[in-house]
Amino acid sequence: YAIDLTSEGQNGVATGIFVNGKDVYASGWYEEGKVKIPFFWKNGQLLRLFSKAENAVTSKIFVSGNDVYVLGNETIYDPVTSHPVSTGVYWKNGNEILLTNDKEGSQANSLFVSGTDVYVVGFRGSFEKIKHGYWINGDFVPLYDSMNCTGLDDIFIVK
């Protein structure tokens, strides 16, 4: 399968790939002007992911059974300060799931699905205090606080 990263003259970026049987999935995003729009491809067919944010990018894709999970990060703007806030997000079968508590930003770095459990690793917090950890089914589990360059970048579940 081929993926056209210049569809309709736009610049595109492929960010992840997953093979499930005979199906090939890829995550990515297109840039339309200054706006980044998330997509994924299945067997070369482009499928748009809808986001409430002005800018959203993808980073990973995972398939479990018939469910397609695409991980990414969005930029939303604080309604009080108008400052940009990064928010981790994943889409399950095209439905957007935000990884935030509406009080602080977050970043999603990797995703793994085991049975019905969805694990996402990353961090949440503000510039003053970052909590590294993971989400399981949307609930954040902090592992440590750090303002250093240390981070969590991948997750796997072994049973």
Task: Label the predicted regions.
Residues Y1-K159:
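Residue-level hotspots at or immediately adjacent to binding/recognition sites across diverse folds
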